[in-house]
């Protein structure tokens, strides 16, 4: 999987940037995503996170990670309008699945609050957002149990334990 990383803050260590690419590629293999899959991750500060949270979620505060899933729109492609394209073909035509915005301020706060490393927190946020982009959620206890178990399984197998 190709991951484009942008550090808007200029404060994220290169080790965290590399770890983020690696843990997302690891998670993509776990979900059997195609190698051609693409996504982006942007590291932001709390001010930008607040702005994005308000814009996309109508929530007036910063948050740790914002996940924006991208689904290709059939109207973007030229073909007979009576023709329906299979999901697999749409994915091949546009392999971009979404983007994450991770707040470096929230990552530091939460690592301290939970008593684990900053590396673990960045990994947790990246995998959490990645799973949201891939259809996982935690609105119900059942969904939460499934998502968090998979998230922990990925992080532990990768080596980011508590």
Swiss-Prot record:
Binds 1 zinc ion. One of its GO terms (cellular component) is cytoplasm. Zn(2+) binds at residues 128, 132, 138. GO terms for biological process: rRNA processing. It comes from the Bacteria. Its EC number is 3.1.-.-. Keywords: Cytoplasm, Endonuclease, Hydrolase, Metal-binding, Nuclease, Ribosome biogenesis, rRNA processing, Zinc. Its main location: cytoplasm. It is found in: Cytoplasm. Its cofactor is Zn(2+). SUPFAM superfamilies: Metalloproteases ('zincins'), catalytic domain. GO terms for molecular function: metalloendopeptidase activity; RNA endonuclease activity; zinc ion binding. It holds the Pfam family YbeY. Belongs to the endoribonuclease YbeY family. Single strand-specific metallo-endoribonuclease involved in late-stage 70S ribosome quality control and in maturation of the 3' terminus of the 16S rRNA. NCBIfam families: rRNA maturation RNase YbeY. This is Endoribonuclease YbeY. It comes from Lactococcus lactis subsp. cremoris (strain MG1363). The lineage of its organism: Bacteria, Bacillati, Bacillota, Bacilli, Lactobacillales.
């Amino acid at each position: 999987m190709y991951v484009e990383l942008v550090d808007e803050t200029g404060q994220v260590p290169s080790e965290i940037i590399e770890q983020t690419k690696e843990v997302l590629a690891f998670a993509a293999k776990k979900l059997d995503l195609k190698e051609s899959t693409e996504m982006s991750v942007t590291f932001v500060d709390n001010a930008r996170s607040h702005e994005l949270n308000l814009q996309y979620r109508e929530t007036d505060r910063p948050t740790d990670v914002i996940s924006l899933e991208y689904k290709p729109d059939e109207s973007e492609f030229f073909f007979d309008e009576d023709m329906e394209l299979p999901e697999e073909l749409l994915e091949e035509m546009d392999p971009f699945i979404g983007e994450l915005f991770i707040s470096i301020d929230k990552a530091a706060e939460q690592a301290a609050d939970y008593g684990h490393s900053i590396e673990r927190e960045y990994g947790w946020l990246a995998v959490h957002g990645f799973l949201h982009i891939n259809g996982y959620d935690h609105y119900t206890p059942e969904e939460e149990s499934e998502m968090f178990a998979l998230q922990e399984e990925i992080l532990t197998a990768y080596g980011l334990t508590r």
